């Protein structure tokens, strides 16, 4: 099996790329807009290409990767915030990640990415009485032609907040 590759959206200080390296996955690119986290990853992960703001990234124009990770902003989903949910300005950036994944899948005829990993706060499960999490599950399906049972099975067995 060939080496897995990773692209990280909403990268922050490179948590997903660092975890990828520990798991034998090669980070290729990252999208982040905050200057200090970019400085951190530029120094710690010099092999990582910074592709800019997630709102302007086109998934067809970046290197195709096996895994796309994204921890879209949590402020609007958190129980500590105003709970605007996915309709909020920051947490709504989730939809840009799905767009980028869809663009890459179309450009690679469905070959890449093979995996998409979304991380967020526990409030994402209860935001708007669970309807935001239902949107998180169904939106990628409508874009990428995955099957909902596969996503739900993965969610139950691996990504439960109670695991």
What are these regions (language model features)?
Residues 2-113, 118-133:
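Core alpha/beta nucleotide-donor-binding catalytic domains of modification enzymes
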Residues 105, 151-154:
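Amphipathic alpha-helical oligomerization segments
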Residues 133-143:
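Conserved Class I S-adenosyl-L-methionine
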Residues 144-150:
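Conserved small/polar residues in nucleotide/adenosyl-binding loops
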Residues 155-163:
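Hydrophobic alpha-helical segments, chiefly the membrane-spanning helices
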């Amino acid at each position: 099996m060939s080496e897995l590759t990773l692209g990280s959206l909403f990268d922050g200080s490179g948590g997903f790329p660092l975890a990828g390296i520990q798991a034998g996955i090669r980070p290729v690119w990252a999208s982040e807009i905050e200057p200090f986290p970019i400085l951190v990853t530029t120094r710690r992960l010099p092999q990582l290409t910074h592709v800019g703001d997630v709102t302007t990234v086109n998934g067809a124009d970046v290197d195709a990767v096996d895994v796309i990770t994204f921890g879209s902003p949590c402020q609007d989903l958190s129980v500590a915030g105003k709970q605007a949910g996915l309709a909020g300005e920051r947490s709504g950036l989730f939809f840009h990640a799905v767009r980028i994944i869809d663009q890459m899948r179309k450009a690679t005829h469905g070959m890449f990415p093979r995996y998409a990993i979304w991380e967020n706060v526990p409030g994402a499960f209860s935001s708007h009485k669970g309807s935001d999490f239902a949107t998180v599950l169904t939106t990628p399906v409508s874009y990428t032609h995955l099957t909902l049972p596969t996503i739900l099975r993965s969610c139950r067995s691996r990504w439960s907040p109670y695991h």
